């Protein structure tokens, strides 16, 4: 009998050595005392946890003796945290405070369609933007959207365009945080002005056809509203480095301060992008920045400030090539055309799809600068001393908007945004006599190879062309590389 007692004692010893306990309690609203059903309670550093029931109670079983930290969280409330020493069953109650004005949920001043509106629309989430957009222009993520076609055109950074139901960008209202971005003169949208907006995009809604927009914008084709990231409740940041063909290099850095003194929060993103381009001469040299700030004046009264911009310059590829030069698919398509010149097929059938006529080499002895009208300067160094771009785009058009959200009562809310968008920049092109290098005489598209620019020839001709009708000694240029400059400022207030 004595031996049996010893065996039983040894058998049950682990139960006493590893006693299991229960932590229980309630999760309630700190101001009203109401139960917070569904609140999560977690033992930090373990897989143990529980969800609060309808009456706000929770229970976590099989907790070994020891010291632990418990956290409780639920959407719309600030997280709670408590420490507890467990040597038996313990009770831990949480009283959570409402999050200060839900700073992480930016209310956008924009006309967005909902489930019950008779508008065809598609929403693109931030997760989709991060997974599918990469370093492309914003419109490219909409290519899988019904009735939408987007293309990068010649491949230059920011040179994309979008068509909705057959209408081009002049008939599509493009907005950032509810602020219209179409050109005031011709309605076009220059995506190079927003080259880095994809890195700060929270969501995109594409409305197809006439929609709920109550602004004077050209929206017969549709409405595209880009929503940027709000200020974040939690402190943190991220760093991203991207590499690609054509010497592509893109660096992105982001930082959020989190909520400071339950009153304010700041977020900032900066992007640097460079590369020689996939197409010949389609280099890019760009920066992008995004800044957000939010301040809680009082309950139901909030101010937000946002600024976004993308100072950039890039080479363009704007000339169409003979269809047979577009690789195997181009040759196949050309052969299917009854009126296509077969002689051209023989000349262009082995064309280099990466060829671009918007640039050409120039002698290193040429020291001319490029005309430039940005940041108070009139001239700037060329991107590369070994070549000249006929077509180059440069611009910086920041957007700054101040949002005010005011809850008048339970049935009325007032949203007001004051904004400014402006800047300067332009693009290059040629005037006067052309200096080209066709392989043989003939039409430029039917030479044995596409023509190229002869910049050295143009410089020589301009340097030895005394025109006595204008001046007895000075040379008169036969052809010039011009820069067209655009300066604009747009102010506005939207309230509803």
Q: What do these predicted ranges mean?
A:
Residues 302-401, 428-486:
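Acidic/polar loop-and-plug regions of large Gram-negative outer-membrane beta-barrel proteins
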Residues 28, 32, 39-44, 73-77, ...:
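Short, acidic, small-residue-rich periplasmic hinge/interaction motif at the N-terminus
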Residues 61-62, 131, 161, 180-208, ...:
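Short acidic/polar hinge/loop motifs at secondary-structure boundaries
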Residues 46-57:
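Short, acidic Ser/Thr/Gly-rich low-complexity loop/linker segments typical of extracellular
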Residues 195-240:
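A beta-strand signature from Gram-negative outer-membrane beta-barrel systems
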Residues 113-115, 169, 181, 229, ...:
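Structural signature of outer-membrane beta-barrel domains
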Residues 236, 243-274, 279-317, 324-362, ...:
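Transmembrane beta-barrel wall of Gram-negative outer-membrane proteins
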């Amino acid at each position: 009998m004595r031996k049996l007692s010893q065996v039983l004692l040894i058998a049950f010893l682990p139960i006493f050595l590893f006693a299991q306990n229960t932590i229980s309690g309630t999760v309630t609203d700190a101001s009203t005392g109401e139960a917070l059903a569904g609140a999560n309670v977690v033992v930090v550093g373990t897989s143990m946890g529980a969800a609060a029931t309808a009456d706000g109670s929770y229970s976590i079983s099989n907790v070994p003796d020891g010291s632990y930290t418990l956290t409780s969280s639920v959407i719309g409330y600030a997280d709670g945290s408590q420490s507890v020493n467990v040597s038996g069953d313990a009770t831990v109650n949480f009283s959570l405070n409402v999050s200060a004005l839900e700073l992480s949920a930016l209310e956008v001043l924009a006309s967005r369609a909902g489930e019950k509106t008779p508008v065809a629309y598609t929403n693109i989430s931030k997760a989709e933007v991060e997974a599918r957009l990469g370093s492309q222009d914003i419109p490219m993520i909409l290519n899988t959207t019904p009735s939408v076609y987007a293309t990068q055109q010649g491949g230059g950074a920011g040179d994309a365009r979008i068509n909705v139901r057959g209408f081009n960008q002049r008939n599509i209202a493009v907005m950032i945080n509810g602020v219209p971005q179409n050109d005031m003169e011709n309605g076009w949208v220059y995506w190079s002005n927003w080259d880095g907006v994809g890195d700060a995009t929270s969501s995109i809604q594409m409305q197809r056809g006439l929609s709920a927009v109550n602004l004077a914008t050209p929206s017969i084709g549709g409405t595209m509203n880009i929503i940027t990231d709000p200020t974040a409740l939690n402190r943190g940041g991220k760093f991203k480095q991207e590499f690609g063909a054509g010497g592509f290099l893109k660096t992105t850095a982001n930082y959020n301060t989190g909520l400071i003194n339950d009153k304010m929060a700041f977020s900032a993103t900066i992007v640097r992008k460079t590369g020689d381009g996939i197409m010949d001469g389609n280099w890019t040299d760009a920066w992008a920045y995004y800044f957000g700030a939010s301040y809680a004046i009082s309950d139901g009264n909030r101010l937000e400030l946002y600024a976004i911009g993308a100072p950039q310059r890039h080479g363009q590829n704007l000339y169409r090539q003979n269809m047979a030069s577009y690789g195997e698919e181009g040759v196949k398509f050309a052969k299917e055309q009854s009126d296509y010149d077969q002689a051209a097929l023989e000349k262009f059938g082995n064309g280099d799809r990466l060829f671009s006529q918007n640039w050409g080499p120039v002698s290193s002895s040429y020291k001319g600068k490029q005309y430039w009208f940005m940041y108070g300067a009139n001239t700037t160094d060329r991107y590369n001393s070994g070549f000249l771009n006929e077509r180059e785009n440069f611009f910086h058009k920041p957007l700054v908007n101040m949002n005010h959200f005011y809850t008048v009562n339970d049935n009325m809310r007032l949203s007001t945004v004051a904004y400014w968008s402006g800047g300067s920049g332009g693009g290059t092109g040629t005037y006067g006599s052309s200096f080209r290098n066709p392989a043989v005489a003939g039409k430029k598209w039917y030479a044995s190879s596409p023509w190229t620019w002869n910049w050295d020839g143009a410089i020589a001709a301009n340097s030895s062309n005394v025109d006595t009708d204008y001046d007895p000694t000075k040379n008169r240029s036969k052809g010039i590389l011009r820069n067209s400059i655009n300066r604009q400022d747009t102010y506005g207030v939207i309230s509803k």
